[in-house]
Every structure is written in C-alpha cells, then in structure tokens.
Amino acid sequence: MSNQEYTFQTEINQLLDLMIHSLYSNKEIFLRELISNASDALDKLNYLMLTDEKLKGLNITPSIHLSFDSQKKTLTIKDNGIGMDKNDLIEHLGTIAKSGTKSFLSALSGDKKKDSALIGQFGVGFYSAFMVASKIVVQTKKVTNHQAYAWVSDGKGKFEISECVKEEQGTEITLFLKEEDSHFASRWEIDGIVKKYSEHIPFPIFLTYTDTKFEGEGDHKKEVKEEKCDQINQASALWKMNKSELKDKDYKDFYQSFAHDNSEPLSYIHNKVEGSLEYTTLFYIPSKAPFDMFRVDYKSGVKLYVKRVFITDDDKELLPSYLRFVKGVIDSEDLPLNVSREILQQNKILANIRSASVKKILSEIERLSKDEKNYHKFYEPFGKVLKEGLYGDFENKEKLLELLRFYSKDKEKLISLKEYRENLKENQKSIYYLLGENLDLLKASPLLEKYAQKGYDVLLLSDEIDAFVMPGVNEYDKTPFRDASHSESLKELGLEEINDEVKDQFKDLMKAFEENLKDEIKGVELSSHLTSAVALIGDEQNAMMANFMRQMGQSVPESKKTLELNPNHAILQKLLKCEDKEQLSAFIWLLYDGAKLLEKGALKDAKSFNERLNSVLLKAL
C-alpha cells in the first residue's frame, strides 16, 4: 500500500495552530499526555486478555519504554498495549469524533497558562506533542491485526498513513523535536518530568539512555559508553498503598496525572474496606467543574479495577449521575476479572460498593460545608448538579438537603435549610420557595410582598434543575415545602378573599382588560395578595410545566396566562373613572407590559410599548 494523504478536520487544524503558536506556557505536559495514552492502551489490552477468548493465551509484560537521541533531536514513547489499525488512526488522530476538540476550543479563555491546563481534560493530549515537535511519526499494530501502520504529520493540515513492518502489538511514537525544544531529548529532563507527573502510572516506565564513564588514569584514561535501561517510576497503584506511607503531595500529584488537571483537588477520600467485602476507593473532589458536566455524553471520572486490573472507565453506574464531577478509582477484590458491563449493572457487590462510596463522598462534602466561607469553592461549580440527587437518590435525600444552599428574599448570601428553619416566624407553617428564570426577576416579584408583610422569608430558586426536583421534595425537618406562587401557600398567609361588592365594582373594568388583551391572556382576576404592584401575570400550572420543559432542554411555547389585578391600587381606582376608551386602552396595555417586564425582564414588542408610553406622557404634560 502506498502512502495515502488525508486532511485534518477543520477543528483539528484550529487546535494544531493553537498548540504550535499559543499554548506553550507548560510544554512539558506533552510527555505526561503521551504516557497517559500509553497507560490507557495497556489497560485496554489487559481487559481484552481477560474477556476475549482469542487473546487469553497472549503472554506479555505490559510496559512503557522511553528513549531519545540528543544528536538527532528525537524522543520516542513506546508501549505494548492494544495498538491501532488504520481506521483507529484516522478516527483518533485525524478527526474530531473522539477528541472533544470542539468543546476544548469553545472553552479557551485566552489565558495561555489556563488554556494549556485544559489539554488533557478535553482528551486532546496527543496533539500537545506538536508544541515541541516539528514532525511526529506513529507506528502501531493492533493486537487483533497482522498488518501494522505508520501515521506521519508535521501538523500543517495533513497527515499520511501507510503500511509498515512492526512485529509486536502496541504503539511507538517518535517526536522530531524543534530546535528550541531539543532539551527534552535528555535523560534528566525526561526523568524529572516522569517523576513529576507519572510516578504512579500503574505500569513500569523504562528509560533507555547511554551512560558515560571514564576508566583508567592519566594517559590511559578512556571514555566508556554503556547503554542502560532503568525503570524511572514506582509503577505502584497509589490507591493500594497504605495511607500512612503517603503524603498530601503524593495524593495531589497522582490526581493531576490521573485527572489530567493541573489544578489541585479540593479534597480526596482514600478508603480501604476489609471484611465480607474487600475493596479500596480513592475519590477526588476537583476544584473546577469538568467541561462536559452538563452534557448528556459526559465521561465518567471513575475507573473500575478488579485486583488492580483495569476493567472500565466508561461505566456511568459506578456513581450516581449527580456525583459525576467526582474523579477516582474503585478497586474490588471480589468482582470476577472477566466481568461484563451487563453484569456490572446488576452486580450486588458493585451496588454495595456504590452505596457505601456515595455515603463517604457526601460525608466529605458535609465536612467541607462546616466552613461556610470556603464551602462556596465547592458549591459554586457543583451545587447545581448536586441538586439532581433530590430527584433519584431517596436514600440520601435528607443528607443532600443539608448540603444544598439557596438564595432567599431576606439574605444577600446563600443559606442552608437549617438556617432558614431556625429563622421561621412564630406562625409560619412552611418553607416557601419561588421558581423563576433568574435571581433579579425573582427578587422583584410582586408575589413576595405579602410574605414580606408577614416577615416570612422565601427561597429564590433560579436554577433550571429546581423546577424539576422541588415538586418531589415534601419536607425538611418536619416542615413542609410550599411553592410561594401556589394558591395553597397564599391561603396560609390568611388573606381575605375578594368580596362580591368589589368584584361587581370592577366588573366593567375587568371586561375592558379582557377585550383589549384577548389575544394575550386567558383571563383577568382580582387578587388579594398584591400590595404595591398593580398587576401580576400568574398561572401556577403553566409555570410548572414551562420550568419543567426548560430543564428537559425543550423550547417553551407561548401560552396565554391569567392577569391578576390589585383592586386596592390607586391606579386601578382611578381607571374605574376613566371614560376615554382610547386612553383607557393605552393604560391597560401599559399595565400589561409592566407585568410582563416583571415576569420576563423583557418585552416581545418594545416598539409598541414605547409608542404607548409616549402617547400617555404627551397627554399628561
């Protein structure tokens, strides 16, 4: 087969241009990324050797080998893992399908240090090698194939693939280093980077180098060169080590390598269980949210091992989805080595490990919450996703409620339900909350006025997830939750109903509202729960459905709602006496527009609103 030339996808070209010209603040991470990829390839081969009958007789010692040539300015990374075939090369090294490149590009901030830290997190680590290499040659042979392939590119828009000769399965990557980056072809440079980032990769990393020493003395002294191959990492599964042997730095270094994250984690939980079940877990709570946390196709941050043998890193059942920001390892002594994904989903051992792990993680979050000043470092990135647990994790619902924080009518900061509960007024029967699209609109809601008169605080919930989960939350500490917009809640305020005399007094004016706004609203009602506001747009059933649809990612169709009027307001009292139909119509529309502004913060037809306002002002002056 002759060389076949391919063109990188557009996004890959953009990425390569960034790698080569912009993201150079921490170039050494390229080696961390290539070693991590090699480790993944070894993990995958180990798993296949357990599950694929054709490969069970394969006898290999998994390892990663590094070598360099300082004269030729080359650096080579070699593994004997699963390898790639031609299609894998095109898919993984030429297209966006597996790389997360589009998400990476959209997440760039312009800060070179921060942006370079994103490289591994977004699965685009291979391309980081172009920060230091003018050309890359990949030779690879898939374990299930007889034919090996070579991939060659200078990172300038194209790559070539051809057949090649390679006896052993696995992948060998050779970097032709740029002049200014030739220092990476050095024993001590490579050794230092591996010890910094890859000390606890669970496979041995060997470095081949030429050792120079002198023998003899005086005129008989001569230089002797000897090729050596040393293991330069511990190759120890850090999670299997005793906690007493490990320092805080060990945990943090492992996290940065494992999670491809240059920042330090907020916290970690290392736990070893012995007894009827034996397993070890090491979980990390990151300091920033994974880029794909709110995507349906988010990648699990937890790897499952059985007796140190990698099983999967793509099982979203290892932890509940509301803890998908957690990174870490579960290593079981009791699961069968050839466990399939289908068996995993029904396995009682794993279910027990999962249940205990969730409790451990929530307990750690509870520990973080004891320091409210620092708790925001956790809650700001992860509070929204934590709320999802209220919908499905009934076993831990009470614990989750303790961990959640909310804005409220009376407080300028996030508060806990415990704090709200401690400040209940003497006759207050419920915990009140109000759902809306954003915090500013909620704070301005006329619905809050009567609660304020009673001295009742109201939780203001503007996250989309709130509308999805709150209807399923019945109580906290024996105090029921109530939506502040619902009629049931308003009854608890002890409001008097509008009497027939007032209804009769406003009958003609309400008819005028209905005639003018017949295409906009489904009806007009007099309300006893408004104080300073003239009008309010309300419809509790439609509001619940709209919030639910937003949470499900669906567009919310326009629907007619009820316009509630405050019969005690001076403006409405004056409108009762307005006999100019044209002017009355203008007033009605202005009041409706005002109510829409309070509801949405914007108007669909701002031009007409402005014309009506000008007309009324002109007549008033």
From Swiss-Prot:
Pfam families: HATPase_c_3, HSP90. Residues 342-547 are annotated as: B. Transmembrane segments: none annotated. It is found in: Cytoplasm. Keywords: ATP-binding, Chaperone, Cytoplasm, Nucleotide-binding, Stress response. Residues 548-621 are annotated as: C. GO terms for cellular component: cytoplasm. Molecular chaperone. Has ATPase activity. Homodimer. This is Chaperone protein HtpG. It comes from Helicobacter pylori (strain HPAG1). The gene is htpG.
